[in-house]
């Protein structure tokens, strides 16, 4: 805790009466709370004031936080104080008597810095200069310092008192202690027994004090002072140890000899009164006199001791001088005797030298002559050796591989023979490596849990034509990854989008728009990218991607590639994608380089392409993924990993080499020492022998001893030769300069001997460290090998993700590869850029050295030969004929080696002098272990098929349409897709028919279905009908073609879905048949769409378009469908239609209104009033059988209409409407997905699972990944209303079985089993779903007979008179419509109201209580008679308002327009009104007359028409709702003026939709 004004700071405690809910002021710095702001403010100011000090260091002038930080750092610094020094330092502190802390610190630091204590960790400097961390086991005192020097004084000597006249108290104290200090042992004389901290080192060793040191900053004055501050305090003016520290470390019981073998030091005492330079306050005058007398006596005592020591020293000096003089005289006498003896010997030696001088000169001349002869012979040998070395140097120089004269034949590799064409095999390997390297980044394991292999996946994908095979999975993986990554990048661009000005400046800086070609390409790509939005209602990424639509989505993606390159994301592309532009897109490059392939995709399935064409597509998709930001970041991360792994591997190798060098040097040193010892022993023996011979023969043979000595001296030459044998590396240097090097060699021998003797002790020290057991060495070696292997694996995996490059090239320029994904050593024979002369052996320029330029030819690099392959070479006799080299015309191929024996042969045959082969050989030797490990798992059968299986497999991969149709593998993909499309068309038609969502407008449905099922497509084009308008298909197609001749060309974008058959193929039958099949199947889908009632279609094909375009998405969808040129395009339109159908309205999903359960369709009847399902056993009273004719539920029964509460009894219509809508089933409401997930609904297990999956679709955003590509079949294809399903994977089983739709139970079974039966007709049980529940009434008129023929099967099944016989749903003709009632039918002319009737018929929705003359005639009669009997008009107003609010087209009129959303609305509309206002007036009985109510309604419509243009969705909804209002008003007997009925407001053409 910091000190406040150098006093402890105490926090303020919280008040005792503090309430839990009381508001207080909290000070975060001191963790205190205050009730009053003034206290809080005062404490805050105090914390920020410089009045605090650190409690540890005592540093003043700090703020509270600074003091806390100072304490933290000081305590952290104290943690590093050596623990073995704590007790010794405290013990020494206890011996001091100082009044200042820094004086104690100086005394202790001066004593401790040169002494080291037991258990202390120090650094020992070894003999070789390295530092070793050791622990002190024992402190050894010097042996010669025992006794008096070690402080063991006798009591008599220690108590001698000498009187001194000094009156200085400090001199007294220092002199007294000096008597002991002079005898203190020098700290450098101590020795220490240390033990290394590493266990593998030796146990212990004794070192000198000069070899020991503490680590830097481990023990310093500052740290010691900080430590003493924590454990010391001032007591009576003297610094003493705190009582807590004294007792905690047991200082009183400690013995200093345990820490250091010397007597404890005696420190200088400093008087306490000198602390501040002022006399102490507590000492009296009497005490001062006593202290002064004691100090005087002590000074006298010290002076006497000093005088005594001085006299003793003088006596000792006199004795020593006398002894030295005596020894000097004895030495002089001995020297004189030796001198005389030496002079006698010199005289005798002079005489002997004169006698042998002549013989010595003769021998010397003979020796010189022999020496000259030997020197000549050596010079001759040296010259020959130099020439040979020059020859070897020239011969071993690197050269062109084909110029080497010792080339060996390379082992013949096995050619690769697989189902793939040879030219595709290399690209297949590239795709395989890409998938293995980047599969983790793009979640490859989701599509291929077992991984991607060459034989099982890639070969089958490229050769086979199965639409559900590996090619589908691969393309789905690529497109999914691309779409996902592009969506993520779009989000990042949106976040980082810059201003328009900056974007413009950046675009101009990058100069992207300067190239008109790029601009044109980007414009075309943008046009192609907009096509799916215009014709399918969603973007390309949102289309349903499955095996059937894959070809078309792939083609659209290729065409739209480059559309994302805009000026808005220029900065992002420049910063994150390396300046990516449209021409960098691999798919755009494919589109530009292979336009025929893109055109072929428009009419052919991708599964029927050739392997080469498939590989081009896969190659382009790989290139597309490589340009993404995520891939670039992934590669950069692995580049960093590779760099780090290589650095670690280099360090590991350097460490291994260092250890090996040290071990080798130690062995060499030991051998040299042994040889040196032997030589010294021999020299000693020779010297002794020579001395004996000299003494024996000196008198008989004069000069013999001298001659032998000379011979001995010349033996240094032999010694020189021996030394040369020890150091063979310097032989040539000695031979080059024999005179000088010989003398220096002699000197070096002596120096080496001296150095070896000096280092012998160091070697012995090193040998002590070496003893490692064999098991430990083996374990260490295995650990290093394991670490090296892990680093190599890490490097290889990083290389696979960054840059795979060949091992090298041989003499024939063949590349050698090893791949991480497949085992084996592969050879690529690529002859591009080579000429024939480059593959032929050429004479080496080394053999004919006549021309100086030949060596230059022999050492040309590989690049120089490639660059000069077209130039002429000077080759002796061929110089006169200058011929251009011929390029090599050979197909590229791949080969492989399959065994380690072949690898050994290859390494042996490679030439070490060639440029390419030397590098290849070195690489193969380095990678030999890894290659052999791969070859051990290599299967030769996968890469080399026999000829017979290869021939048998060719027909499988061909696109024969006449092959057996029974076997799917023998079918072409086009045929497979055709059969599947027929199944799906029949299935969706059956689901629409069974679900009462509509019916195809043909004479006989069964004939139509059998024609489609049996492939008799010519029977499909009998006639087509759209919502009652009979129109032949030929007329329809002709109209479409005449209307859109230019539109199709513009929309198809360079060949999108062209109808013209391909003229490339010479066979006219196959393309024609395919075109006809596509045309008829598209026509069948068109007929199915025409048969769906408009009210059961939702976005994007709901026909509502809020924009200003006169064509809706549905219109463009129809145009695109009829101009489809491939089956995949038809599949794409089918998925869009399936996504747009309101399957929740299907009767197959009907739910009982009472028990809220699905199923048991045989016992379910539909109410003719509300179209709600009711089980016969749930109705009260129960129904014994399905009733004939009309049946109404209890709520819709006419007699119960009067029981409804009047408007006066209900506070608001809103609550009633909400209550009724809450009771309605989720099949009637589009936005009631929350009800589907309620746990209180007890449904069948399969149905509940489907409901849960549908809820997930509605609540969660669509995901791009999918578990499978196949199209499973399910009868209930519901979609979430808010989040429509994008793809097949989110709606498993979109296309149900036609044979399993009799009951909802069967549909559940079919959905769970995912089965599809393609050849069975629908059973008759499906007809009984609604049979008997209602009766069908027909008019005898001729016109009605036509509709009976066309629509009677559907009206019987569905029983919807409102859909078939009401004026809203009757078929339309030129100027008439059929108005059918129970009593009469009449033809009403439609001049201006024809469009209103059509729009109204499309706007009807299920689940609404519709009042028509046919379905509920009784209420109509009661209403008409009620008005005649005086019934109040408010009941009619109330009923009409409810009908208007519940109408689907009432959404623009429910509430007033918000002024915030539409600011200018109230500037144009002066009298705004809405249905909620009208409803409030009805509830408050504000309408006195019917005309007021009708005027408000008409004012609402006139406001809509005045503000919104005619073609907007709001105006269309107003038109339909106004027509509905007029009809209902007439039915209720309300009078609407003709002028109001005929009133049609002309909206402003320039206004846009505001609501």
From Swiss-Prot:
Q: Where is the composition biased (Basic and acidic residues)?
A: 652-664, 671-696
| Position of the Glycyl lysine isopeptide (Lys-Gly) (interchain with G-Cter in SUMO2) cross-link | 954
Please provide, alphabetically and separated by semicolons, the GO molecular function terms listed in this UniProt record.
zinc ion binding
Residues of the Bromo domain: 1429-1532
Composition skew (Basic residues), residue ranges: 1263-1277
Q: Where is this region: Interaction with SMARCA5?
A: 668-935
UniProt-annotated location(s):
Nucleus
Where is the sequence biased in composition, kind Polar residues? 1297-1313, 1369-1386
GO biological process terms held by the UniProt record: chromatin remodeling; nucleosome assembly; positive regulation of DNA replication; regulation of DNA replication
Listed under subunit, the entry gives: Component of the ACF-1 ISWI chromatin remodeling complex at least composed of SMARCA1 and BAZ1A, which regulates the spacing of histone octamers on the DNA template to facilitate access to DNA. Within the ACF-1 ISWI chromatin remodeling complex interacts with SMARCA1; the interaction is direct. Component of the ACF-5 ISWI chromatin remodeling complex (also called the ACF complex) at least composed of BAZ1A and SMARCA5/SNF2H, which regulates the spacing of histone octamers on the DNA template to facilitate access to DNA.
State what protein this is by name: Bromodomain adjacent to zinc finger domain protein 1A
Organism, per UniProt? Mus musculus
